[in-house]
Amino acid sequence: MEIPGSLCKKVKLSNNAQNWGMQRATNVTYQAHHVSRNKRGQVVGTRGGFRGCTVWLTGLSGAGKTTVSMALEEYLVCHGIPCYTLDGDNIRQGLNKNLGFSPEDREENVRRIAEVAKLFADAGLVCITSFISPYTQDRNNARQIHEGASLPFFEVFVDAPLHVCEQRDVKGLYKKARAGEIKGFTGIDSEYEKPEAPELVLKTDSCDVNDCVQQVVELLQERDIVPVDASYEVKELYVPENKLHLAKTDAETLPALKINKVDMQWVQVLAEGWATPLNGFMREREYLQCLHFDCLLDGGVINLSVPIVLTATHEDKERLDGCTAFALMYEGRRVAILRNPEFFEHRKEERCARQWGTTCKNHPYIKMVMEQGDWLIGGDLQVLDRVYWNDGLDQYRLTPTELKQKFKDMNADAVFAFQLRNPVHNGHALLMQDTHKQLLERGYRRPVLLLHPLGGWTKDDDVPLMWRMKQHAAVLEEGVLNPETTVVAIFPSPMMYAGPTEVQWHCRARMVAGANFYIVGRDPAGMPHPETGKDLYEPSHGAKVLTMAPGLITLEIVPFRVAAYNKKKKRMDYYDSEHHEDFEFISGTRMRKLAREGQKPPEGFMAPKAWTVLTEYYKSLEKA
């Protein structure tokens, strides 16, 4: 908020400076730019297109202008829309620090801001201004400055009753104004002229910040400033309830393609919207973009690094090619319809070389690919019913839409996600605890952890999902992670062990579910080379790639140093090469060996109850 009256020391201006708005130079000629706005729009931001405009937030001190403006700025930047906020307090500390709060100075304050905002808008940015700007004429002048330059101007009245603004008065300025300690305070002894015909009114006494931001975004979408697809709404592929009976009847009459369990897991991924904006299994154009660029490029740069494809044999192609639709059948049940199918060659070796960086047939997922059909099928997917596995864990399989709602219900102002396919040890917990601490230090009040184990296919020697979920529950029970600020859910994707390529998929899927931050540690989505036993991928590359990956714009990557067991401190700690002798690296192989033999790990490596779950799992294998 702007601080008026005696709280702002007014600097005495020279005569020339005092009258500068009245002087007119005769030797100044406007210079036209060589770069057009359309050309500038091609290189500003990640989506292309000129979006320059000004969103002018006006309202009483304490109405919520700064809160809305900063949240709107964050939203737009995270969705690839370049923007910048000019805040009243900030500007009065620099450009306008020589202005006070007289009517004349308020007028000059607004004029300067309008001119600067016009330049920002002309550069292709969405310029958000957050000023009391109490006078109608001054705001009209700001509009005229923009209209004279053929730039859109949107006046947004941030409307909160005076008594609400006084209740929010964390700096006590209204109290001082009521006591006469501040003179000329807007709303108390200086008039605020409400906008007569603003483009938008935000009732901040009854709407939360997110609702206000969405209202402004919708306005900008209506005026073709922000593309509709920039909001990354989750695209679920379930048939709507009112069309379900007809679709099921249709499915029974269509030819069918049998699919396996991994295919069904990908059906679930698509149906729930994890692969937004895909309409179904990738068509050839999408497949090639994914394979060669790790992105979808139609409608902006959208990170999608792993092919989500359906395979078919030559016999299936001969039978189904030419059909306008066919059903997908899993375990004798028709679960989905694929419409307008497109068949194209499944070049397996090329796919594996690009996706995994190897064609080693002993790699578990590559082995599956090499055994699949020689054709790929893309098409629009309609899933008939929600996917349930009836394994006692379906309550953890929350969709992106459900997760977003849960975070909202928890009043989360930051969501940080942790992907894992292994049991949680205290090194993992250290990363999550430190992230929570960092977010609090950055000013977030309610950061929430999404502990999100992968729930699709994994290789044979990985701990099964059921046991991992029991182990995660024990970690929470022992208080290693805070149950009050942690959401445990299952991510339905199969595991591909594709290293830096796959970790981008893991990250962007959590982005769709509402995560703002993504924790990445050592060798994400990696595994030992099936033949040499060495790391298939350089362990630090996954984190490095994520920090550079295009299209992951709505969340921030949180890379961490390697955690190892500190023998002196008897706990997991960040590895320090200068004290190498103090550290011990406990590999997954050794951890499994200890658990299998019923031995205890070093003190502080894992929560005791969580370790007990692991030993019980390996004992169950011996009995089997």
From Swiss-Prot:
Pfam families: APS_kinase, ATP-sulfurylase, PUA_2
Claim: Manganese is one of the keywords in the record: no
Residues engaged in binding adenosine 5'-phosphosulfate: D89, N90, I91, R92, F101, R106, E107, E108, N109, I132, S133, K171, G184, F185
Documented EC number(s): 2.7.7.4, 2.7.1.25
GO biological process: 3'-phosphoadenosine 5'-phosphosulfate biosynthetic process; skeletal system development; sulfate assimilation
Tissue spec: Expressed in testis, pancreas, kidney, thymus, prostate, ovary, small intestine, colon, leukocytes and liver. Also expressed in high endothelial venules (HEV) cells and in cartilage.
Activity regulation, per record: Inhibited by chlorate. The kinase activity is subject to inhibition by the substrate adenylyl sulfate.
The protein's annotated pathway: Sulfur metabolism; sulfate assimilation
UniProt binding sites for ATP 1: G62, A63, G64, K65, T66, T67, C207, C212
Any one GO cellular component localisation term in the record: nucleus
Binding site for ATP 2: Q419, L420, R421, N422, G521, R522, D523, P524, A525, A563
Keywords, alphabetical: Acetylation, ATP-binding, Kinase, Multifunctional enzyme, Nucleotide-binding, Nucleotidyltransferase, Transferase
InterPro entries: APS_kinase, ATP-Sase_PUA-like_dom, P-loop_NTPase, PUA-like_sf, Rossmann-like_a/b/a_fold, Sulfurylase_cat_dom, Sulphate_adenylyltransferase
Region feature Sulfate adenylyltransferase, mapped onto this chain: 234-624
Residues annotated with N-acetylmethionine modification: M1
Catalysed transformations (reactions): sulfate + ATP + H(+) = adenosine 5'-phosphosulfate + diphosphate; adenosine 5'-phosphosulfate + ATP = 3'-phosphoadenylyl sulfate + ADP + H(+)
Gene3D superfamilies: HUPs (3.40.50.620), P-loop containing nucleotide triphosphate hydrolases (3.40.50.300), Sulfate adenylyltransferase (3.10.400.10)
HAMAP family listed in its UniProt record: Adenylyl_sulf_kinase
Recorded family membership: In the N-terminal section; belongs to the APS kinase family.
NCBIfam families in alphabetical order: apsK (TIGR00455), PRK03846.1 (NF003013), sopT (TIGR00339)
Function, as annotated: Bifunctional enzyme with both ATP sulfurylase and APS kinase activity, which mediates two steps in the sulfate activation pathway. The first step is the transfer of a sulfate group to ATP to yield adenosine 5'-phosphosulfate (APS), and the second step is the transfer of a phosphate group from ATP to APS yielding 3'-phosphoadenylylsulfate (PAPS: activated sulfate donor used by sulfotransferase). In mammals, PAPS is the sole source of sulfate; APS appears to be only an intermediate in the sulfate-activation pathway.
Domain characteristics, as noted in the entry: The N-terminal first 50 residues are required for inhibition by the substrate adenylyl sulfate.
Assembly: Homodimer.
Name of the protein: Bifunctional 3'-phosphoadenosine 5'-phosphosulfate synthase 1
Organism: Homo sapiens (Human)
GN (gene name): PAPSS1
